[in-house]
């Protein structure tokens, strides 16, 4: 049987909110296995969202119901069930297959958003996205081409040759 995770997404967080304060806020709804604020890998600063993993589905659902739209550290937060970490790509602003601006060359990927990433980027596999470093599909600043990307990756070519 596959491991089941009862994880919720928490958005709209203050940059000052840390893993411990996130856990403290959600632990009243059930057993919290993990709490994680997502940070920018270059600056180390919070990206304004995180995840809380519960021991049970019931605890996760109670937390979502109770905390969505509530104040945490002076900000109204958004809480919903996290999407599973599958590698089937697509999604985001602009969606898969070109994204904002479409493909820039005959190769797959290019454009702002890239194929499979979209604005904000996909985290698994081809695509990249605006500023994404994960995946290799291009996009603005993406991992395999695109403006600011690496030369010669699997993607839509570089903005400048």
Curated annotation (Swiss-Prot):
Q: Which GO terms describe its molecular function?
A: RNA binding; single-stranded DNA binding
Q: Which residues carry this modification: Phosphoserine?
A: 87
Q: What is a biological process (GO) this protein takes part in?
A: mRNA processing
Gly residues composition-biased segments: 89-161
Top-level taxonomic group: Eukaryota
Location of region: Disordered: 72-161
Q: Which residues form a coiled coil?
A: none
Q: Which residues form the RRM domain?
A: 6-84
Classification via InterPro entries: Nucleotide-bd_a/b_plait_sf (IPR012677), RBD_domain_sf (IPR035979), RRM2_NsCP33-like (IPR048289), RRM_dom (IPR000504), SLIRP/GR-RBP-like (IPR052462)
Instruction: Specify one Pfam family.
Output: RRM_1
Q: Which UniProt keywords apply?
A: DNA-binding, mRNA processing, Phosphoprotein, RNA-binding, Stress response, Transcription
Question: What switches on its expression?
Answer: Induced by low temperature stress or foliar application of the phytohormone abscisic acid (ABA).
This chain's function reads:
Binds single-stranded DNA and homoribopolymers of guanine, uracil and adenine, but not cytosine. Also binds RNA, with a preference for RNA containing a high proportion of adenine within an open loop structure. Possibly has a role in RNA transcription or processing during stress.
What is this protein identified as?
Answer: Glycine-rich RNA-binding protein blt801
Native source species: Hordeum vulgare (Barley)
